[in-house]
Amino acid sequence: MGMKIGNDPFHKRTATGIGDQFMRQAVRKAQDGLRVKKLKATESLGNWEEWRALGEEIRKHTLENLDYYLYELSENIEKNGGFVYFAKTAEDAREYVKEIVKKKNAKKIVKSKSMVTEEISLNEAIEEAGAEVLETDLAEFILQVNDHDPPSHIVVPCLHKDKEHICEIFKTKLNYTGTSDPTEMARFVRSYLRDDFFAADIGVTGCNFAVAESGSISIVANEGNARLTTTLPKTLITVMGMERIVPTWEELDVLVTLLCRSSVGQKLTSYITGLTEPGGTDGPEEFHLVIVDNGRSDIVGTEFQSVLQCIRCAACINVCPVYRHIGGHAYGSIYPGPIGAVLTPLLGGYDEYKDLPYASSLCGACTEACPVKIPLHDLLIKHRSRIVEEKQSPVAWNVAMKGFEKAVKSPRLFSFAAKSAPYALKPLAKGDKIERGIGPLKAWTDARDFPVPKKQPFREWFEKHVKENDDGHSKS
């Protein structure tokens, strides 16, 4: 799949999202529900801000010493009998996994939920190597069955589907004969996948956090699929972004506490799976850890480094007013919402994603929601500044801003423009509102009321008001 979703331009994707009434209703319901659950879950911790500060401190320290902890992690995994591969690019990661698949002559691979494997198009690479890949996370399974529908949310990938849609997908694709009851459908999927876990040659997982001091990986989940994926196949491949690491189990405890409460409003998820070494009675015989860079090292040491503090909880997405209206697919990336608007241009470049930093009201709700205090709205502003500096913004926009700059720098020109505006805009007005804008203004007036400027400019009114007050004081 890769990081990119679709080929439509941003304005078309947003129009599609805004026009999808079911999706908008589903997002509103999910956001409202998750926000309430998170509030209740965080209240039980006491001072939530102290926990956030601790989470930020842990993530900052880890990133500032990332080379040290990655070295410690790799050394300990190899001591434990595992193999570590540092993949500079997505292509490097794909080729390494393909070689394992070919070497093992693997025909069936089970896979638990992983955003980084989506980012590097790992499923397609495995299929090229001649093996079948089965997504075993329920939401990811639904999307895969539905002709590889892309995810719309980091934690709830099929947020844009309801139970009736899912039931219809199962009936069409899997000959399901049951009802749309979620429990019944979940049982059907469990039964459908059960034999595949036992028949799988290789298991592939993501990694919420790797623990450097012990060479362990941890997976946080609410379904048993991740645990089955890590224990039943003889070979396990875990793929992680290079930043998904903690120094010790003590720090892991803090971050898991923040993650569970921030993502789905739980004190703890149903399963927290830890794997330290292969060869145990309930684990794989062979373990490979693929540590993916894919542009992350270019972010380290820059003004955007704090985005790598992200623990993929989606708390920012769950409060974002823009995501609420346009949905996840409108971002054109597997990473939607505020975190996606910051991260995606850094990994994918401005040529493809220069619109995303503008998909924000800059309200700051995302920053307040983030459990590790990433200053997301500040980073979006930094993106916008860089886009302008690199002349990535549209020509029409640059011309308009140059004209505006000249107008506000010249008192005479500014005064003329302010006095002329009511008359220039009169043909577009109905009453005291502008009904239809011209060019870029059209998108604004189609959805919002735009008042006609007053005939008396504010500066003129203010000068007159001050003079009248001064005269009144002098007479008294």
UniProtKB/Swiss-Prot annotation:
- What's the name of its gene? lutB1
Residues annotated to bind [4Fe-4S] cluster 2: 320, 363, 366
Q: Can you tell me which family this protein belongs to?
A: Belongs to the LutB/YkgF family.
Q: Where is the 4Fe-4S ferredoxin-type domain?
A: 301-331, 350-379
GO BP terms, alphabetized: lactate metabolic process
User: What SUPFAM superfamilies does the database record attribute to this sequence?
Assistant: alpha-helical ferredoxin, NagB/RpiA/CoA transferase-like
Q: What protein name is recorded for this chain? A: Lactate utilization protein B 1
Q: Does the keyword Cytoplasm apply?
A: no
Q: Which GO terms describe its molecular function?
A: 4 iron, 4 sulfur cluster binding; metal ion binding
